[in-house]
Curated annotation (Swiss-Prot):
Name of the protein described by the UniProt record: Translation factor GUF1 homolog, mitochondrial
Interval spanned by the transit peptide: 1-54
Family: Belongs to the TRAFAC class translation factor GTPase superfamily. Classic translation factor GTPase family. LepA subfamily.
GO annotation, biological process: positive regulation of translation; translation
Residues noted as binding GTP in the record, renumbered to the chain: 77-84, 160-164, 214-217
Enzyme nomenclature, EC number: 3.6.5.-
An annotated Gene Ontology molecular function: GTP binding
Gene that encodes the chain: guf1
Length: 685
């Protein structure tokens, strides 16, 4: 049948059928009667299978958008201030969202609510983002917009960024592709810690910042107070703020005209008849069919399919297989021009080749590389092990696939006596670690055991050599150690004044040193502490939210290393060290930590036929000890009287047997026991 269709002349119908077959698209057409303005209309809807093949007629021509009609901007804010909802509203305003997520006028109320929810979370692609209601990965989208003031069409490139401090690296690299930013502030909560951190990131990048006060529809919104906070904190004039409600759509139409009017266009191209191509790589992800897809900002020249480009970082040459923009999904275009943001498919096989901050240029026209980014710096390390040791290979493959979309993770092989083979992984923060573990389970079906998070310590040895320790098991012994330096951070806590005493006590208990205190508008205070990173990567943030009823916010940045009096706490079971339970703690906290640990261990270790001694030691000093008594068999049960020496003989024989068993026996902490220990640690927190 298929061959007959191909051999039937060039009639219109047969030609169309042949084209459809060559495109490998399965299309079903249905006819339905719908009502528009209370009048029946006949609509034809086509449902296509998931094929990414797009004909050349569907490609966008971007050559008409000169740099003066292009605006590149990000949306930055503190977590949960409404960035993604606002971004999706702008996509809806410009007609960029696909119609399939809108629903029809005949949909039920439940269907409409689901449609509304899909629209609000459209830019949150990952399942973990939708479940937690947070943005983890920055998302890019290009919008076409006709400005009513001058009647011109503009190309607006929007980047929705994360708000949590763990993902500030995503924000910083996104800002490098922009000339401006919308600083979104909650009309109820006002300026928070991450609001200030993101503002200064934008300021350091030389961006024009437009303040946007969101959620003005809430009954508790205080717009005038937030305007004053923006003025005091950043120097904005009260009239500079755009007032909106991303939920209801109030004021949304004022944002894009402000973007066009106040954010400068990309720089003019070099005045030359042949401008050499130069582009900045600011993001990438992996597609198993097409390889690495790179998001770029074209600084000069243009790039099209078939061009040969060179990476300034690794000096390798790549052929461009595809070019396009995110509108909102991948949409092919003949070329990308100066000032435009889009994607290219250069045929890279691994994401390691796509180094964020790299410069691309044409093969025969080398250029000066652009200023790049600082690589992501891992702040928290943990051991990750499969629940079943047979799943080690699958876990490694799953991690490698995940790292293709998140290059900020580091991974090295590690072996534990208790848990077997696994990995020592580095993360940007505790939330980042939690998100990665959740993605491993949801996207790859890998349930893992994670050891307590640690931070990297610098150790100066007696021979003058300096080493970096991220695994407590590798901490050097006292006779080989000269000094230890622990990582420090500068933490900024913004809180209502009524919680000041409790928050300061929490910071002091976490070995924080107060360096600054500032009174803000609206009965709020901002305090600055120098913290050891190891004190705040576990339960500090949760405790801060608990004692402040959720109103306090935290932001922190790296502050180098500082000499510290820390020690390694070793755990011994009948004299045998369990490496996976080792920890590095400050000596002032060593005894309290040790007592808590051995008590929890006593609950999860099964009783043996011999006595089990649990010890927590620092050097040769025992900090805490617990004993699990042996199970005892009543060997005298068969004695019904008679000489007492018979009973003593049986008891002495049992005692001698237990002594030999203790010498030869081995106490093992099972994976189930280790998992219970980790859960009890979280419960205690």
């Amino acid at each position: 049948m298929f061959s007959r269709l191909l051999n039937r002349g060039n009639g219109g119908v047969n030609k169309n059928i042949t084209s459809g077959l060559l495109l490998r698209r399965t299309t079903t057409t249905t006819t339905r009667l719908s009502y528009i303005n209370n009048s029946p209309t006949l609509s034809i809807r086509s449902f296509c299978s998931k094929s990414t093949t797009i004909t050349s007629d569907e490609k966008l021509d971007l050559s008409g958008y000169t740099t003066d009609r292009i605006r590149n901007f990000s949306i930055i804010a503190h977590i949960d201030h409404g960035k993604t909802t606002l971004s999706t509203k702008l996509l809806s305003l410009t007609g960029t969202l696909p119609k399939s997520i809108y629903g029809s006028g005949e949909d039920s109320l439940v269907q409409k609510e689901k449609s509304e929810e899909r629209r609000e979370q459209y830019l949150d692609k990952l399942q973990v983002e939708k479940e937690r209601g947070i943005t983890v990965k920055a998302q890019t989208c290009t919008m076409k917009y006709r400005n009513k003031e001058d009647g011109k069409d503009y190309l607006l490139n929007l980047i929705d960024t994360p708000g949590h401090v763990d993902f500030s690296y995503e924000v910083s690299r996104s800002l490098m592709a922009c000339q401006g930013a919308l600083l979104v502030v909650d009309a109820v909560q006002g300026v928070q810690a991450q609001t200030m951190a993101n503002y200064y990131l934008a300021l350091d990048s030389g961006l024009e910042v437009i303040p946007v006060i969101n959620k003005i529809d809430l009954p508790t919104a205080d717009v005038e107070r937030v305007k004053q906070e923006l003025k005091d904190a950043f120097g904005f004039h009260p009239d500079d703020a755009v007032l909106v409600s991303a939920k209801t759509g109030v004021g949304i139409t004022d944002i894009l005209p402000a973007v066009i009017d106040r954010i400068p266009p990309p720089q003019e191209p070099t005045k030359s008849p042949k401008v050499p191509f130069k582009a900045l790589l600011f993001d990438s992800w992996f597609d198993r069919f097409r390889g690495v897809i790179c998001l770029i900002k074209v600084v000069d020249g243009k790039v099209k399919k078939g061009d040969s480009i060179v990476s300034a970082g690794n000096k390798q040459t790549y052929e461009v297989f595809d070019v396009g923009i995110m509108h909102p999904e991948q949409r092919p275009a003949p070329s990308l021009f100066t000032g435009q943001v889009g994607y290219i498919t250069p045929g890279m096989k691994t994401s390691k080749e796509a180094r964020v901050g790299d410069t691309f240029y044409m093969k025969d026209f080398p250029v000066e590389p652009l200023p790049g980014f600082q690589p992501a710096k891992q702040m928290v390390f943990a051991g990750i092990y499969p629940v079943d040791s047979l799943d080690y290979t699958q876990l490694r493959e799953s991690f490698e696939k995940l790292m293709l979309t998140d290059s900020s993770i580091s991974m090295t092989n590690e072996t534990s006596v208790a848990l077997g083979m696994g990995f020592r992984c580095g993360f940007l923060g505790l939330l980042h670690m939690d998100v990665v573990l959740q993605r491993l389970e949801q996207e790859y079906g890998q349930v893992v055991i994670a050891t307590p998070p640690t931070v990297p310590y610098r150790c100066l040895l007696t021979d003058g050599k300096e080493i970096l320790i991220s695994n407590p098991a590798g901490y050097p012994s006292a006779e080989h150690l000269s000094k230890t330096f622990e990582p420090m951070v500068t933490g900024h806590v913004t809180l209502p004044t009524e919680y000041f005493g409790a928050v300061v006590k929490l910071c002091m208990d976490s070995r924080g040193i107060l360096t600054n205190q500032e009174t803000l508008e609206g009965n709020r205070t901002r305090i600055t502490f120098n913290f050891p990173l190891g004190e705040i990567v576990t339960d500090f943030y949760d405790n801060l939210k608990r004692i402040s009823s959720g109103y306090a916010s935290l932001d922190y940045e790296d502050n180098g290393y500082q000499e510290s009096d820390v020690a390694k706490v070793r755990v011994l079971l009948n004299g045998e060290e369990v490496d996976s339970l080792s920890a590095i703690v400050h000596k002032s906290n060593a005894q309290r930590y040790s007592r808590s640990l051995v008590k929890r261990l006593r609950k999860v270790i099964d009783r043996q036929m011999f006595q089990v001694n649990i010890q927590a030691m620092v050097g040769s000093d025992v900090q805490a000890r617990e004993t699990i008594s042996a199970m005892r068999k009543d060997v005298t049960a068969k004695c019904y009287g008679g000489d007492i020496t018979r009973r003593r003989k049986l008891l002495d024989k049992q005692k001698e047997g237990k002594k030999r068993m203790k010498q030869m026996g081995c106490v093992e902490l099972s994976q189930e026991g280790f998992l219970k220990l980790m859960k009890s640690t979280n419960d205690d927190d």
